[in-house]
C-alpha cells in the first residue's frame, strides 16, 4: 500500500487534508477520508515523520506541523501564524530539516521559518521578504507573485519563481533569513511557476504558467541558463489554459506537466543527460483543473488531483519504458484537491 495525502482549498466543500491508501497491485484507491480538518491547506510537505501544511485562521496566516502516526493519522504539533500578508501556495523543508520555506503568491513574499528538528515544531518565522522587481505585461502580472520556494540540489541556495516578474531568484539562507544571490530573467509574460531538477542536479525544468511552456535550463551555482523550450498544450488548442505542476519520474527518464483548462498531462522524454526534451503525448486528466499530481516511489503510478469539476482523483498506470499513462481508477473524490503528497 502507498499512503498519501491531498491538500485542498476550503472555500467550497474542501475539508483540508485528505488521507488515502493506494493498492500498489491494482492501482485503485481503497480508502480516502478526511485526515485533518484545517483551513486553506493548499500545499503540503513532509520531513520524515512530520507533515507540514499551509493554513490560516481569519487574517492570521502561516503553517501548521503534524506528527504522522504509524497508521497515517495526523496529530497536530503546533501552528505558526505570524503574518497577516496572505496565505502561501507552496512549502518545502530544507534538506537539513532546520528550515521551512513558504511562497506567498498574492503578496509576492518569500518566508523562511525555523524548525525544531527533534519535535517537528515550527519555532518562529525568521523572515518575510517581499519581491520588488519590474513586472511583466500580462494582465495577471500586476505585481510580484512568488509561486515556488525550494532548496537547490547542491544544498547551497533556495530558489523562488516569480510569476509576476518573469524571474527566478536565488537566495542564500540561514539563521539570519534570506540574502539575494542571483536573478535569472525569462521572457516577458512567461510567468514562471514551478521547477523540477534533474536527478544529477545539473539541469532544471522551469514551467511557465502564462506561456504554457517549459524551459530546459542548465543549473550552475544558483544560476539558470535556458537551453530550449517546449509547449505543453497542442498548437491547435484555442481555449484558455494555464500550466500547473511539474514532476520528474524517479528514474529521471520522463517529465510530466499538468495543464488546467486543457485538462491534461503533457509527457516528455528526457534526452542528452537532461539537456533536452522530446514530446511523447498529451494525456487527458479526466476531470477539471488538474492542479497537482505525484508519482509513486515505484514509478508505477501517477496520482492526479483536480481542483474543479467533480474533484476526482485520477490514478494512471505508468509505462516505465515509454513513460505513457493509462487510466486505472477515477472513483475517489477529494473536494478542491490541489496538492498530492506521497
UniProtKB/Swiss-Prot annotation:
Pfam families xrefs: Lactonase (PF10282)
- At the top level, the lineage of the source is Bacteria
Under the heading SUPFAM superfamilies, the entry gives: C-terminal (heme d1) domain of cytochrome cd1-nitrite reductase
Recorded GO cellular component terms are: cytosol
- Molecular function GO labels: 6-phosphogluconolactonase activity
InterPro entries in the record: Cycloisomerase_2 (IPR050282), Haem_d1_sf (IPR011048), Lactonase_7-beta_prop (IPR019405), WD40/YVTN_repeat-like_dom_sf (IPR015943)
Query: Family assignment?
Result: Belongs to the cycloisomerase 2 family.
Question: What protein does this entry describe?
Answer: Uncharacterized protein SERP1457
